[in-house]
Amino acid sequence: MDDDHEQLVEELEAVEAIYPDLLSKKQEDGSIIVVKVPQHEYMTLQISFPTHYPSEEAPNVIEVGVCTSLAKRDLYDTKYLQHLFQEVMDSVFHRGSVCLFDFLTELDGVLYVEPEEETEPVQQSDIPTDPFEGWTASDPITDRGSTFMAFAAHVTSEEQAFAMLDLLKTDSKMRKANHVMSAWRIKQDGSAATYQDSDDDGETAAGSRMLHLITIMDVWNVIVVVARWFGGAHIGPDRFKHINSTAREAVVRAGFDS
């Protein structure tokens, strides 16, 4: 068994352990699988793994199926979804590293739709006029010319979170950032409604990792933002380490993890 195939076998075993009953092999050697999307099991994907995966080539999304009522099925353009999912696959693939788990994790963010609910308008007094009012900052981290800095704030609604984020982005230094990534978790008092989401702002998978961070920290009514100023040199996966490190520092400094 060559190294590529051995890594594929181990990856499929790991994914099957994490998501029991969601994955089946269409080819005995695992070169083609059928997998239901976690949290969205009505959608199934056929994925093929090239001979030189993961050393050189990314997996291919070859078919998307939707198992739902006929009326709802008409709402899905499976050809478009196949193209979209392949873009997600290509974005999480890095030569030499398996990527199926990261791919499935990213799909949850792509497919998630926030239920529509009536919300009370944000009171104008809740929105500061100073871009940094209400935010707690981390220390900046600089690596090979790129600088990362995080900000965390207490919020009680998505509307307040978005208003504060929009105002933060008006600062001259923030406008120069190449990416302003964000994640938030909000639980409203007296209601079972919760709001959890993220925004990569072009830095693929960064927002979902930040959301995962504040989820495992078990903090609520928080928005965390990480700005990255790009210095010209690509730093690979180290960027995610810096994003998470500054995000955690800002959240802790803001008093959420005391």
From Swiss-Prot:
PROSITE patterns on file: RWD, UPF0029
UniProt entry keywords in alphabetical sequence: Actin-binding, Cytoplasm, Isopeptide bond, Nucleus, Repressor, Stress response, Translation regulation, Ubl conjugation
Principal place of residence: cytoplasm
Entries under SMART domains matching the protein: RWD
Biological process per Gene Ontology, one example term: regulation of translational initiation
InterPro entries listed in its UniProt record: Impact, Impact_N, Impact_N_sf, Ribosomal_Su5_D2-typ_SF, RWD_dom, UBQ-conjugating_enzyme/RWD, UPF0029_Impact_CS
UniProt-recorded Gene Ontology molecular function terms: actin monomer binding; protein kinase inhibitor activity; ribosome binding
Record's GO cellular component terms: cytoplasm; nucleus
Compartments, record wording: Cytoplasm; Nucleus
One Pfam entry name: UPF0029
Keyword Cytoplasm part of the UniProt annotation: yes
Domain named RWD: residues: 10-114
Keyword Ubl conjugation set for record: yes
Cross-link (Glycyl lysine isopeptide (Lys-Gly) (interchain with G-Cter in ubiquitin)): K187
General function of this protein: Translational regulator that ensures constant high levels of translation under amino acid starvation. Plays a role as a negative regulator of the GCN2 kinase activity; impairs GCN1-mediated GCN2 activation, and hence GCN2-mediated eIF-2-alpha phosphorylation in amino acid-starved cells and subsequent down-regulation of protein synthesis. In normal conditions, it resides in a actin complex and has no activity.
Homology family: Belongs to the IMPACT family.
PANTHER family named among the record's database cross-references: IMPACT-RELATED (PTHR16301), PROTEIN IMPACT (PTHR16301:SF25)
Further details from the record: Present with 3030 molecules/cell in log phase SD medium.
Subunit structure as annotated in this protein's UniProt entry: Interacts (via N-terminus) with GCN1 (via C-terminus); this interaction reduces the GCN1-GCN20 complex formation and prevents the interaction of GCN1 with GCN2 protein kinase and GCN2 activation in amino acid-starved cells. Interacts (via C-terminus) with ACT1; this interaction occurs in a GCN1-independent manner. Interacts with RPL39; this interaction occurs in a GCN1-independent manner. Associates (via middle region) with ribosomes; this association occurs in a GCN1-independent manner and persists under amino acid starvation conditions.
Protein name per its UniProtKB record: Protein IMPACT homolog
Species in which this protein is naturally found: Saccharomyces cerevisiae (strain ATCC 204508 / S288c) (Baker's yeast)
